[in-house]
Amino acid sequence: MSTHYIAGQWLAGQGETLESLDPVGQGVVWSGRGADATQVDAAVCAAREAFPAWARRPLEQRIELLERFAATLKSRADELARVIGEETGKPLWESATEVTSMVNKVAISVQAFRERTGEKSGPLADATAVLRHKPHGVVAVFGPYNFPGHLPNGHIVPALLAGNCVVFKPSELTPKVAELTLKAWIQAGLPAGVLNLVQGGRETGVALAAHRGLDGLFFTGSSRTGNLLHSQFGGQPQKILALEMGGNNPLVVEEVADLDAAVYTIIQSAFISAGQRCTCARRLLVPQGAWGDALLARLVAVSATLRVGRFDEQPAPFMGAVISLSAAEHLLKAQEHLIGKGAQPLLAMTQPIDGAALLTPGILDVSAVAERPDEEFFGPLLQVIRYSDFAAAIREANATQYGLAAGLLSDSRERFEQFLVESRAGIVNWNKQLTGAASSAPFGGIGASGNHRPSAYYAADYCAYPVASLESPSVSLPATLTPGISL
């Protein structure tokens, strides 16, 4: 089966056998063989060969091609949404919004490139000072499984726009989405070698990340893998490394007038996408006392009624499956471990169908747990921590190596301004779901959550480097020579 796209040709893999499975029914969605080191090398070489012509292509022509890609995505939106749902387990309504985000990424990237890069000039003494931006060359893009279309797209589109050529390695759990996305690029007329696809797991990823022909690597995924890449790229300052990783995100709740609005916002923050967004709330900080008790009682009651089901079920579920049976098992074991350390299950996470990666929402009160693990449990498992006062809430919110997202539900603007200053996160929301983000704003965090701001408006910053020039049409003597020189 031809599963890799290298130098404008579809090729069969020569590496390990791969399958992607429907997370609910466990049927085979895609099968093939991964790319081995030789094929990875061929992909990097193809990108290097294509780079000079692509980088010299006028910006407006590159934009035209990207706009044709967006139009192709629109024309194939239903097909792509279904494949995303089938392979990830997320409901069709959510898959459709992902495709829309992929389409919109083109216009956002063009706007960002024009505003944040491009060319600027001005007079400086007897010369002209010019600022330009140039592409790095050949970059690798590693994609995650939770948004297998949108998140890699957030690297690939700005990278190509800036004039780079790309070798794309998607998650081994979502190869079919990647294959269909590549076909949309091909339909849009992308030249051979400009974007190459190598499918595979660890073997393929290690070969690509270690390739000496790369000028950079853009990654969205787990902190564990991101840390490995960071170590691997250590001592290579000549290469650009952009990492967007996870978070142990806190959502602090104060007593608010509209309790149901707070409950809805918490659910959207913690359980959207079955908890498989890097900005999902992992820790819910609730005040001690009667109001906090009432909030949790209502949260548990509503969460217990959330519809969970297959991606194409009707009526549509709120939550689909997590990505795989192994992911579901890991989450259930994490819940068991926390309960064993003293956590109180307010709503136990369950697996309603044996052999399916469907999970119901889980809510644990971990206030009494000593040495709580600072870990991102990537699924519908929410930890509740009761706090005594706002200062204690902020201390608890910041008690993490991560720094991706933090949120506050409060009727007090003064409280939010304090939270904004004292919290440690790249995204800080007030009375909005933690998973909400503006495409015109930077997306990313600090600490173990990564560097740079991939997948959003600021992606232009790491896809091209600035070049400063002093220019004059001819060589001429200055009006006054430097002391000690005579001509």
Curated annotation (Swiss-Prot):
Disulfide bonds: none annotated. GO terms for molecular function: succinylglutamate-semialdehyde dehydrogenase activity. Signal peptide: none annotated. InterPro entries: Ald_DH/histidinol_DH, Ald_DH_C, Ald_DH_CS_CYS, Ald_DH_CS_GLU, Ald_DH_N, Aldehyde_DH_dom, SuccinylGlu_semiald_DH_AstD. It catalyses: N-succinyl-L-glutamate 5-semialdehyde + NAD(+) + H2O = N-succinyl-L-glutamate + NADH + 2 H(+). NAD(+) binds at G221, S222, S223, R224, T225, G226. This is N-succinylglutamate 5-semialdehyde dehydrogenase. It comes from Pseudomonas aeruginosa (strain ATCC 15692 / DSM 22644 / CIP 104116 / JCM 14847 / LMG 12228 / 1C / PRS 101 / PAO1).
